[in-house]
């Protein structure tokens, strides 16, 4: 039986199946993601990371959500950086990873954490994208079955909508309103939904609904989006700790500069998956 070698990794509880590009070259990657990411029925993960050699740099990555859609992922980027070093794609601690959102600088820190530059956030409606006017799109009212919710929408490589609340939503509200906003017609490519509590100017707490994945324990581009949005609203400074159920991520942003994301990237286990279970 032909098997697929894989690594299981996570960044603050945001977990991924990681595979080498050459081992899946003949497979349909969206279908592979749908199969491998199914919890309880397969390996289970928030996404599939496919890692190979880049055209202009040593490492290239692609990320697929559990529903098969391709996306940008900050925690996935940091896991790819760690995986690339462990598997010998690069020798140094600083290098560049090619992504669908451009080239991203990464650095493995002495304490084992990984730092990544995600680029500058985008606020223009056409780049988020969101069908609204003004830049940035702040306090956009969305009428839900339970009432009006105001969101601030932006892109940090992926589309996010931030909701500031005094306390994180309970399951009923979270599971009702999050998918409603994700699939709202205002968002042509859907949106992740970030329920955010500002605990101090340097500390945020989130509950996360990711487009294409549902609830996740952490989200790297989402942590960046929440930190940037809090700064836009005058609620936070340039350096912010973002807590979510999976742990803490550290975000730094100064207007006009790239957003940087720092946190752990951990190898959980490695294994082999029977390829006969996945059709080309």
Stretches with model-predicted labels:
Residues 1-111, 162-280:
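A glycine-rich beta-to-alpha transition motif near the start of alpha/beta enzyme domains, typified by
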Residues 114, 122-124:
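Ligand-binding beta-strand-loop-alpha-helix segment within the catalytic cores
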Residues 125-136, 270-275:
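Extended Gly/Ser/Thr-rich low-complexity repeat segments
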Residues 138-170:
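Internal active-site segments that recognize and position negatively charged phosphoryl groups
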């Amino acid at each position: 039986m032909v098997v697929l070698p894989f690594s299981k990794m996570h960044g603050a509880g945001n977990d991924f199946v990681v595979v080498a590009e050459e081992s899946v070259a003949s497979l349909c990657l969206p279908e592979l993601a749908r199969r491998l990411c199914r919890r309880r029925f397969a390996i289970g993960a928030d996404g599939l990371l496919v890692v190979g050699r880049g055209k202009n740099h040593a490492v290239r990555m692609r990320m697929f959500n559990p529903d098969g859609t391709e996306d940008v992922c900050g925690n996935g980027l940091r896991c790819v950086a760690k995986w690339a070093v462990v598997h010998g794609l690069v020798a140094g601690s600083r290098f560049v990873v090619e992504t669908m959102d451009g080239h991203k600088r990464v650095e493995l820190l002495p304490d084992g954490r990984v730092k990544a530059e995600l680029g500058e956030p985008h606020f223009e409606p056409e780049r988020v994208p969101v069908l609204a006017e003004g830049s940035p799109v702040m306090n956009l009212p969305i009428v839900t079955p339970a009432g009006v919710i105001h969101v601030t929408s932006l892109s940090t490589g992926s589309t996010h909508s931030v909701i500031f609340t005094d306390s994180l939503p309970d399951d009923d509200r979270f599971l009702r309103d999050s998918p409603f906003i994700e699939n709202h017609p205002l968002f042509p490519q859907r949106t992740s939904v970030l329920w955010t509590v500002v605990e101090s100017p340097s500390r945020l707490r989130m509950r996360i609904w990711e487009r294409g994945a549902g609830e996740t324990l952490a989200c790297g581009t989402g942590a960046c989006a929440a930190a940037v949005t809090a700064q836009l609203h005058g609620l936070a400074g340039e350096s912010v700790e973002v807590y979510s159920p999976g742990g803490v991520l550290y975000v730094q942003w100064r207007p006009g500069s790239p957003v940087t994301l720092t946190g752990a990237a951990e190898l959980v286990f490695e294994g082999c998956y029977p390829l006969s279970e996945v059709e080309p």
